[in-house]
Amino acid sequence: DALPILKISEGGGLTVQQAVMNGELDLAMTALPVEEESALTTRLLFSHPLCVLVPRSGDWLEQTSVSPQQLAAHPLLIYNEDFALSRQLMQLFTRHHVKPRIAVRSGQWDFLAAMVQAGVGVAILPEPICRRLDEKTLRWLPLESDLRWQLGMIWREGVYLSHSAQAWLKCCEGFTLPE
């Protein structure tokens, strides 16, 4: 028996969504929500709040949360433009009439965290990622927003899925990570 070929690749959410829509990928795990006109079926796996990653010093020690308006006063370190979360943050800033001062864009959360430690600015990262960082030098505060980091599976509506893709979806059924 031949085993199915499984290819795992990494890319920003928008790049991955485009690959699924073009038929280059059968399905993918990506940030949700996707654009309504994308004709993609989605299955939410988990959802987490966003945090503002700051140095453990100065005025940040007095803060308990950070509003989108407060972020305008600080250089901002965020994900690359091909990340869905980056697009969602830009929409959040527009809704709150905030003009962000973007200092650094990266696809690597550990690089963004290192830049915060170096004093370059503040970053917006999902809470589970913040929990992996050094609490002695960094602090993460809730972002005052209903925006959440949601990850889920996507695939093209009404298109045949291979047996391996169907098996992977079945594997993901009921799979959620704790809040």
How should these model regions be labeled?
Residues 2-37, 99, 105-108:
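Central regulatory/effector-binding core of bacterial HTH transcription factors
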Residues 2-18, 81, 88, 126, ...:
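N-terminal winged-helix
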Residues 17, 21, 42, 68, ...:
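Short hydrophobic/charged patches on amphipathic alpha-helices used for structural packing
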Residues 37-48, 63-64, 110-158:
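Beta-alpha-beta core module
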Residues 39-50, 54-76:
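Flexible hinge/capping segments at coil-to-helix
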Residues 53-59, 152-161:
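A bilobed periplasmic-binding-protein/Venus flytrap-type ligand-binding module shared by bacterial periplasmic
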Residues 54-55, 79-80, 102, 125-126:
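Thr-Gly-centered strand-to-loop micro-motif
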Residues 60, 75-96, 161-170, 178-179:
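Secondary-structure junction motif
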